[in-house]
Amino acid sequence: MALYEHIFIVRPDVSPAQMESLLEETKALIEEKGGKTGKIEYWGLRNLSYRINKSRKGHYGLIDIDAEADVINELERLQRLSEDVIRHMTLRVEAHTEEPSAILTKKDDRRGRRERN
């Protein structure tokens, strides 16, 4: 099995609770097809670099996946059909890291600076 990182962006009018359930549904789909999931991160509502489908913001999610290519193909097919998902990207990686992603680390750094002042 190969290792992948799957990042997707969901419309801004979706609630954070719905985004969490979407992450859980994605995890269930991967495990149902015989894959395994590693860390799952919800990055929150973030500004987009450019407009996508008239949206300036989006909810970001990241899932580390250990699965065969057909599982990834099915996941991407379902996300293309979903009205909530406005962008998705799957990257093949050599190894998964256990530490939080750079996006979450940057958020924590900013929070720490505010507390010192």
From Swiss-Prot:
CDD domains cross-referenced by the UniProt entry: bS6 (cd00473)
Entry-linked PROSITE patterns: RIBOSOMAL_S6 (PS01048)
Domain of life of the organism encoding this protein: Bacteria
Entry's Gene Ontology BP terms: translation
Sample GO molecular function, one term: small ribosomal subunit rRNA binding
A GO CC term assigned to this protein in UniProt: cytosolic small ribosomal subunit
Record's keyword terms, sorted: Ribonucleoprotein, Ribosomal protein, RNA-binding, rRNA-binding
Disordered: annotated span: 97-117
InterPro entries registered for this protein in UniProt: Ribosomal_bS6 (IPR000529), Ribosomal_bS6_CS (IPR020815), Ribosomal_bS6_sf (IPR035980), Ribosomal_S6_plastid/chlpt (IPR020814), Transl_elong_EF1B/ribsomal_bS6 (IPR014717)
Similarity comment: Belongs to the bacterial ribosomal protein bS6 family.
Function description: Binds together with bS18 to 16S ribosomal RNA.
Entry-linked HAMAP family: Ribosomal_bS6
Protein name: Small ribosomal subunit protein bS6
Species this chain originates from: Maricaulis maris (strain MCS10)
